[in-house]
From Swiss-Prot:
Mg(2+) 1 binds at D728, E747. It comes from Clostridium perfringens (strain 13 / Type A). Synthesizes glutathione from L-glutamate and L-cysteine via gamma-L-glutamyl-L-cysteine. Its cofactor is Mg(2+); Mn(2+). It is an enzyme of class 6 (ligase). This is Glutathione biosynthesis bifunctional protein GshAB. Keywords: ATP-binding, Glutathione biosynthesis, Ligase, Magnesium, Manganese, Metal-binding, Multifunctional enzyme, Nucleotide-binding. Mg(2+) 2 binds at E747, N749.
Length: 778
């Protein structure tokens, strides 16, 4: 604890500020170039599906048209920011795959064409394009397409205010806050070489990279080179660095701004954007960063040294994120000293040495001009971090694991990311290795396409809508997780959405009409749309008494005002008084009023209407199993429910099949039970109603059905003035034109699920989430 600030550490401990200290704001900005299947830089334009890159909040371009930049919002936890970068990676990967492209998982470039063929990003602001053109003249395009990750960090304001109160300093709050971040930035500059060693992941480069650098390196395989003992080419003089090491003071904001302004005035750099220091001071809400810093102060720190980690599917591991968090805490608790020009010279020297020679067993770093073995100094820093954790965060397993893993890498360079990459690339080849990973990661995303990572508790339709919003750069906010209530903003207006399809576009009365099946039928009938005949009841005894009216009819018994097929019983054939009474009781469990109506012949189809369009049409096949001649129905259901597409609570494309009263009664009417053993290949239905919510299968019929039925669906939606609704229609023959007696509307749904149209059991994704966004924002 020799060089830790014992006074500050004591105050945080004595005043029980640990819980405030560990809370922070986190953000990530991640770059990847797009590549073809052969590992060549993709020369295609930025995908149109991502909309205007300058307005998209999450998906932009960096230097090159081929270089994507993914930006998370400010997140409250590392788990949250990690989940968000997972979702961005998935959204981007699944979109560019349509053009046969992949995200290149390495900071160093793939197979590059000639300099002049690398496309600069096409932007609306000519100054932004000119800035990039000047970079290409100065550094070369091949260096500019090196990619990496920026890690944005700030403490919660409440922690800084509590610390300000406890320390009783004689300065105003803004100055105190700025001093905290300046202190951290200075210590970061001094010790960041350790992060390069621990996270460096760009030791090898392709033969198509810069010719002069190849001459400095050694051949590793048929298509690649490396600098012996290097950890991060990107952080070295051969990578993404300024031409010179510029001295910029971090002793005050005024000195910081003045030094950078002088670099611009002397034409050393074009603007602060070209100041490629491993850490930069950042202020919110202004185009002119330096003026904003001077007038508003520091809001957060931007860490710029992270390589893409090819061994992590997201390009960065949780371990690295927790390491950085602990390191930022460490920089505040280290001694508070101003740094001189001579200090910075030493920091630059250590930076370059670790980037190019860090894996050498005898590697040294310099401290006050004295060489010290890297491994010895690394252990000392990690020991201090361990003391901090033991004093303040003794129950934090993530921090403890980070220190343990870091020590392993310090003690054995073979455990570093860079060493592992060299070994794997030597065995497989530079392009083959990275393309294998790129394809593996894409397949992983494809297998979990419908999930919004970190938000799996939301209904699947809501998850899909948010994923589509992310693709367009429409910002979202979860307002009530249990209710699936979100807000969406495109920067110009805000839309509130509940359960994916309840929006401002439909009035309250429209929802009430569709909620009430009796009123819905009356309105449709008034508009000359065929609906089933029947009666409504609000008294269970009256309903049971009328058994004699229906006993020879095919009927449906259902609640008047429920969704998702709850409480519905269907009798297409003979049924007993006991079965009838039980169905009436089941319906009354779900509502105070029920309907008993004729059962219409034909197959049932769900039409999804959004705006003036029928977006998708599904036939929902009732819950069923296919026999194998050995297993019981109960066992077959259990096996079918193991499908990863099946789950509970509308969080997967298909719902698990239930074995309840309704299923038992339906099987009984077929002379079967849960213990019956169907023949090999025999299909057994467990329900008459075909809702996905009760275990049904979804089969897309959008392009197979006669267009006249789409007109009927649109007419039905217009009759109740609905812009979003599900129309349940029974049709005798889908190839035959709609006529008076060959179809009928059995229900309108005011909150239709969209996931069944996006991930049908059979058929194509109808992009219902995108259609909702079109309705809300176009």
């Amino acid at each position: 604890m020799v060089n830790l600030d014992k006074g500050l550490l004591k105050i945080i401990k004595d005043e029980s500020l640990e819980d405030y200290f560990i809370k922070a704001n986190f953000g990530l900005e991640k770059e990847n170039v797009r590549v073809t299947e052969s590992g060549n830089l993709a020369l295609t334009p930025h995908p149109k599906a991502f909309g205007d890159r300058e307005k998209n909040a999450y998906i932009k371009t960096d230097f090159s048209e081929s270089q994507l930049e993914m930006v998370t919002p400010v997140c409250n936890t590392l788990e949250e920011v990690y989940s968000f970068i997972c979702n961005l990676n998935k959204v981007v990967s699944l979109e560019i795959m349509k053009n046969g492209e992949f995200l290149w998982p390495q900071s160093n470039p793939p197979i590059l064409p000639r300099e002049e063929e690398i496309p600069i990003a096409k932007l609306s602001n000519r100054e932004d394009e000119l800035y990039r053109e000047n970079l290409s003249y100065k550094y070369g395009k091949k260096k500019q397409v090196i990619s990496g990750i920026h890690y944005n960090f700030s403490f919660k304001e409440e922690f800084i205010k509590l610390l300000y109160k406890e320390l009783k300093v004689e300065k105003d709050f803004r100055e105190f806050k700025d001093d905290i971040y300046l202190r951290m930035a200075r210590n970061f500059q001094k010790y960041h070489w350790l992060l390069i060693y621990l996270t460096g992941a760009s030791p090898v480069f392709h033969e198509s990279y810069i010719e002069e650098i190849k001459e400095e390196g050694e051949k590793l395989g048929e298509d690649s080179y490396y600098i012996k003992d290097d950890t991060s080419l990107r952080n070295s003089s051969y990578g993404y660095k300024n031409k010179k090491d510029y001295y910029v003071s971090y002793n005050s904001i005024e000195e910081y701004a003045s030094d950078i302004k002088n670099l611009v005035k002397d034409k050393e750099i074009q603007s602060i954007k070209e100041y490629y220091n491993p850490i930069r001071l950042k202020s919110l809400g202004s185009e002119d960063m330096l003026e904003s810093l001077l007038h508003k102060g520091i809001d957060y720190l931007e860490v710029r040294l992270l390589d893409l980690d090819p061994l992590s599917i997201q390009g960065v591991s949780k371990e690295t994120l927790y390491l950085l968090h602990l390191f930022m805490i460490y920089t505040l608790l280290k001694e508070n000293k101003e740094i001189t020009y001579k200090d910075q010279e030493e920091f630059f020297k250590n930076h370059d040495m670790v980037a190019l020679k860090g894996r050498n067993e005898e590697a040294v770093i310099y401290e006050n001009g004295v060489p010290v073995l890297l491994k010895d100094k690394g252990r000392e820093i990690l020991s201090e971090m361990d003391e901090i954790v033991e004093i303040l965060f003794s129950n934090n397993e993530e921090f403890k694991n980070v220190i343990k893993r870091a020590l392993e890498k310090i003690n054995n360079p073979h455990d570093t990311i860079s060493e592992k990459l060299i070994k794997d690339i030597k065995e497989e080849g530079y392009i083959n290795f990275h393309m294998r990973l790129a394809k593996e990661y894409l397949n992983n995303f494809k297998n979990k396409e419908f999930n919004l990572v970190g938000y799996e508790d939301l209904e699947l339709s809501t998850q899909i809508l948010i994923l589509d919003a992310i693709k367009r750069g429409i910002e979202f906010n979860i307002m009530d997780r249990l209710e699936n209530f979100i807000s969406l903003s495109d920067g110009e207006k805000v839309e509130y959405v509940k359960q994916a399809t309840k929006t401002s576009k439909d009035s309250y009365i429209t929802a009430l009409i569709m909620e009430n099946k009796l009123v819905t039928k009356d309105i449709l009938r008034e508009n000359n749309i065929r609906v089933p005949k029947g009666k409504d009841y609000d008294n269970i005894d009256e309903a049971k008494k009328d058994f004699r009216l229906f006993k020879d009819e095919k009927i449906v018994i259902k609640p008047k005002s429920t969704n998702f097929g709850l409480g519905i019983s269907i009798f297409p054939g003979e049924y007993s008084r006991e079965d009838y009474d039980k169905a009436v009781e089941i319906a009354f469990r779900e509502d105070s009023s029920i309907l008993i109506e004729e059962f219409m012949t034909g197959k049932e189809y769900r039409f999804l209407v959004i705006g003036e369009e029928v977006v998708g049409i599904l036939h929902r096949e009732p819950a069923n199993v296919i026999g194998n001649g050995e297993s019981t129905i109960e066992e077959l259901v259990s096996e079918k429910n193991k499908d990863p597409l099946r789950g509970k609570g509308y969080k997967t494309p298909l719902e698990k099949i239930k074995l309840g009263e309704i299923e038992e009664m339906f099987l009984k009417n077929q002379g079967l039970s849960f213990k019956s053993i169907p023949k090999n290949g025999e299909k057994i239905y467990l329900r008459e109603n075909s809702n996905i919510s009760t275990g049904g299968d979804s089969i897309d019929f959008t392009d197979k059905i006669h267009p006249s039925y789409k007109e009927v669906a649109l007419k039905s939606a217009k009759a109740v003035k609905a812009l979003i609704c599900g129309v349940d229609m029974v049709i005798d023959n889908i190839e035959e034109e709609a006529k008076e007696k060959n179809h009928g509307i059995i229900e309108l749904n005011f909150n239709p699920a969209i996931h069944i149209h996006c991930f049908p059991y059979k058929g194509e994704n109808r992009k219902a989430g995108e259609k909702i966004l079109d309705l809300l924002f176009n």
